[in-house]
């Protein structure tokens, strides 16, 4: 298995380009938090979640701002993390199908493991052996020697992995004991499968759950296992007896997260019902409701700085992470004020968290405006914002306003083809460009708010401009005057202008913008920040990864062709004119109605009375004046109609077809002379 090694898949697989519109520093979790790890030696908490970012926080309560740093390299949800090597190394598993190895103290990614073929959902760690296991939706379990992973370098970048086979369904949970002698997996198969990681031998299959197994814990010696399931139960298994020895019905809904004390006598559980219980494994009737969260619980992490544990950290589908005290739990038990019937409401031990790591808002709704450049979004705090896809930035925070009203307010009778797609999975705007439609949208420079140095109004391709901006730091895209002598360069505007500057000559995207090259279907090939494409390593990886359709526009400057639209032009029934032979015409879909009116005036109406309207003085007029005269006369004398609706001369053909024609077949336009 090659770590950080990418084969040149760009030529064989369909590759898309994505980028994320965001702030340079995303200080707060922007979505649900899937994973937690506590480093008691440094008083640090690692959170990893659905916004793709791993963050490091100080758990020192005296610090006003707990944020320390972000660890960014993943491109999709981070589903699990484990701290290894006494807190020096962090391993992460993600829905981008990779496992990453991080320097936890310095916060940088050391290597990437690409063995999995689908979402990686769970990790397990054997502390005494420095062994990590990873598993996911591809039904595979891989074993990794952490010391080997941390020794990987650019020249020594291969690592051997063992795999455990036999799972028939997607794996959602994984556990390994500290000694590294037992590994257990839980899946949608509803069974627990058990192996010996030393020999990769299958040991047993444990049946009992009736739904997905979402959480697993193993006793240090590997003799007992705890499982939490979407069926709402917690089960205690004896691996020696190969059977379930106790079932705990504590929760009203699915159990998604478990923690256990070092003595393996008390289990802490949370899940869909938002409640966190502590249950005595020896006396199942004794369970204490510790607290109730505001959202379903995804992960918990015990503070093991003392015995019994003084606190528990809790992550949910919301972005805030809470620390709840456990200090009164023994008095609570001793008083007998515990729940022995989970159907009866009881008072939780804690009503307020001891410490809060505040989260940020997640974008949950978006609307692409008609200009196919701007987007309106609404977040979990009901704040509405206005974004520019082309410049990859937020234009304005609109606050708590009515989302639908803002959409109506910004509606324009203009049609631009779709040229990108939007994904909100991480809680931020991720824009994806695909070869099939990236170059579909042409607009005039004037309509896009750009001015040309020569005062002209060239046609611009939005997808082409954006790709040039995203890769403007990549030296391969830079053109020098010497290159221009050898190659005739077509600018994105279609002009033959000298292009010595980087980018597209109109705008730049923020240099911190993450750019992602990935296979259609989600597998990431390469992620980098826009500004880093000038680096030697990054430039080399771009050479291997950037697909030909992007090379064509950014390196070779080959512009896509204009979109053509076929249409028919006929006299209106009210004009009394003879119907013409039905010729099928074709023009750029951006052609304005006024240009068709000029064509009608000059080539059709004027032909009948050309001898009367042409004079010697007119013949002597400069060509430009003639054109201006025709434009004015056409607008004064001609009307163009579609579906019996008089058309605005400023409208273009694609807008007419989309908003007025609205039917299959070729567009049909009718003309008539205005009544005087």
UniProtKB/Swiss-Prot annotation:
Main localization (coarse): nucleus
InterPro entries attached here? G-protein_beta_WD-40_rep, WD40/YVTN_repeat-like_dom_sf, WD40_repeat_CS, WD40_repeat_dom_sf, WD40_rpt, WDR48, WDR48/Bun107
Note the SMART domains from the entry.
WD40
Q: Is Transmembrane helix one of the keywords UniProt gives this record?
A: no
* Superkingdom, taxonomy of origin: Eukaryota
- One Gene Ontology cellular component annotation held by this UniProt entry: nucleus
Keywords attached to this Swiss-Prot or TrEMBL record, sorted alphabetically, are: Acetylation, Cytoplasm, DNA damage, DNA repair, DNA-binding, Endosome, Lysosome, Nucleus, Phosphoprotein, Repeat, Ubl conjugation pathway, WD repeat
Q: Which residues carry this modification: Phosphothreonine?
A: 613
Q: Which GO terms describe its biological process?
A: DNA damage response; double-strand break repair via homologous recombination; embryonic organ development; homeostasis of number of cells; male gonad development; multicellular organism growth; positive regulation of double-strand break repair via homologous recombination; positive regulation of epithelial cell proliferation
The entry lists its GO molecular-function terms as:
deubiquitinase activator activity; DNA binding; double-stranded DNA binding; single-stranded DNA binding
Q: Which residues carry this modification: N6-acetyllysine?
A: 214, 578
Pinpoint the residue ranges of every WD repeat in the record: 28-67, 73-112, 115-154, 166-205, 208-247, 250-289, 292-334, 358-397
Q: Where in the cell is it found?
A: Nucleus; Cytoplasm; Lysosome; Late endosome
Q: Which residues carry this modification: Phosphotyrosine?
A: 28
The task this protein performs is described as: Regulator of deubiquitinating complexes, which acts as a strong activator of USP1, USP12 and USP46. Enhances the USP1-mediated deubiquitination of FANCD2; USP1 being almost inactive by itself. Activates deubiquitination by increasing the catalytic turnover without increasing the affinity of deubiquitinating enzymes for the substrate. Also activates deubiquitinating activity of complexes containing USP12. Docks at the distal end of the USP12 fingers domain and induces a cascade of structural changes leading to the activation of the enzyme.
Its domain description in UniProt is: The WD repeats are required for the interaction with deubiquitinating enzymes USP1, USP12 and USP46.
Which PANTHER family does the UniProt record give?
WD REPEAT-CONTAINING PROTEIN 48
> What does the annotation say about its assembly with partners?
Interacts with USP46. Interacts with USP1. Interacts with USP12. Component of the USP12-WDR20-WDR48 deubiquitinating complex. Component of the USP12-DMWD-WDR48 deubiquitinating complex. Interacts with PHLPP1. Interacts with RAD51AP1; the interaction is direct and promotes formation of a trimeric complex with RAD51 via RAD51AP1. Interacts with ATAD5; the interaction regulates USP1-mediated PCNA deubiquitination. Interacts with RAD51; the interaction is enhanced under replication stress.
Q: Into which family does the record put it?
A: Belongs to the WD repeat WDR48 family.
Q: What is this protein called?
A: WD repeat-containing protein 48
Please name the source species.
Mus musculus (Mouse)
| Encoding gene (name) | Wdr48
């Amino acid at each position: 298995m090659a770590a950080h090694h990418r084969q040149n898949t760009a030529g064989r697989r369909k590759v898309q380009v994505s980028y994320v519109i965001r702030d340079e520093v995303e200080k707060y979790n922007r979505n649900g938090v899937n994973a937690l790890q506590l480093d008691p030696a440094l008083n640090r908490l690692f959170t990893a979640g659905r916004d793709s970012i791993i963050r490091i926080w100080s758990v020192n309560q005296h610090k006003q701002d707990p944020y320390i740093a972000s660890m960014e390299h993943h491109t999709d949800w981070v589903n699990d993390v484990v701290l290894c090597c006494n807190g020096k190394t962090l391993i992460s598993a993600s829905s981008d199908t990779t496992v990453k190895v991080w320097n936890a103290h310095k916060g940088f990614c050391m290597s990437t493991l690409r063995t999995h073929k689908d979402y990686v959902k769970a990790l397990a760690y054997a502390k005494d052996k420095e062994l990590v296991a990873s598993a996911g939706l591809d039904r595979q379990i891989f074993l990794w020697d952490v010391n080997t992973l941390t020794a990987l370098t650019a020249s020594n970048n291969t690592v051997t992995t063992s795999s455990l086979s036999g799972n028939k369904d997607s794996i959602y949970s994984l556990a390994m004991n500290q000694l590294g002698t037992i590994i257990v997996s839980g899946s949608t198969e509803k069974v627990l499968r058990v192996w010996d990681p030393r020999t990769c031998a299958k040991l047993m299959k444990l049946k009992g759950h009736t739904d997905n197994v979402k959480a697993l814990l193993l006793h240090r010696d590997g003799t007992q296992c705890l499982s939490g399931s979407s069926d709402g139960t917690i089960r205690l298994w004896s691996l020696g007896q190969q059977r379930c020895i106790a079932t705990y019905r504590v929760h009203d809904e699915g159990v998604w997260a478990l923690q256990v004390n070092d003595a393996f006598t008390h289990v802490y559980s949370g899940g869909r019902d938002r409640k966190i219980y502590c249950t005595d494994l020896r006396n199942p009737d004794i369970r204490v409701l510790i607290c109730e969260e505001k959202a379903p619980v995804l992960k918990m992490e015990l503070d093991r700085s003392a015995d019994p544990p003084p606190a528990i950290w809790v992550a949910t589908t919301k972005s805030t992470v809470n620390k709840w005290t456990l200090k009164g739990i023994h008095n609570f038990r001793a008083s007998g004020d515990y729940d022995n019937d989970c159907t009866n409401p009881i008072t939780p031990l804690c009503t307020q968290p001891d410490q809060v790591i505040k989260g940020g808002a997640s974008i949950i709704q978006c609307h692409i405006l008609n200009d196919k450049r701007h987007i309106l979004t609404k977040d979990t705090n009901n704040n509405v914002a206005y974004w520019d896809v082309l410049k990859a930035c937020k234009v304005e925070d609109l606050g708590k306003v009515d989302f639908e009203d803002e959409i109506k307010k910004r509606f324009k009778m203009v049609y631009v083809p779709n040229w990108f797609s939007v994904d909100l999975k991480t809680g931020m705007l991720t824009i994806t460009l695909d070869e099939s439609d990236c170059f579909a949208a042409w607009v005039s420079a004037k309509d896009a708010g750009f001015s040309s140095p020569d005062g002209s109004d060239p046609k611009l391709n939005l997808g082409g401009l954006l790709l040039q901006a995203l890769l403007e730091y990549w030296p391969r895209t830079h053109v020098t005057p010497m290159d221009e002598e050898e190659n005739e360069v077509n600018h994105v505007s279609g002009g033959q202008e000298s292009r010595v500057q980087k980018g597209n000559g109109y705008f730049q995207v923020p240099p911190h913008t993450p750019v992602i090259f990935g296979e259609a279907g989600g597998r990431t090939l390469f992620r980098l920040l826009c500004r880093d494409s000038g680096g030697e390593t990054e430039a080399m990886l771009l050479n291997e990864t950037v697909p030909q359709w992007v090379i064509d526009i950014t390196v070779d400057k080959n512009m896509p062709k204009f979109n053509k639209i076929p249409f028919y032009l006929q006299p209106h029934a009210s004009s009394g004119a003879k119907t013409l032979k039905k010729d099928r015409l074709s023009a750029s879909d951006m052609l304005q109605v006024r240009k068709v009116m000029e064509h009608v005036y000059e080539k059709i109406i004027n032909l009948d009375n050309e001898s009367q309207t042409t004079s010697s003085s007119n013949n002597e007029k400069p060509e430009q004046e003639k054109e201006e005269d025709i434009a004015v006369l056409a607008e004064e004398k001609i009307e163009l109609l579609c579906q019996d609706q008089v058309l605005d001369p400023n409208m273009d053909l694609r807008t007419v077809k989309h908003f007025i024609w609205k039917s299959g077949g070729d567009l049909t336009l009718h003309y008539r002379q205005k009544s005087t």
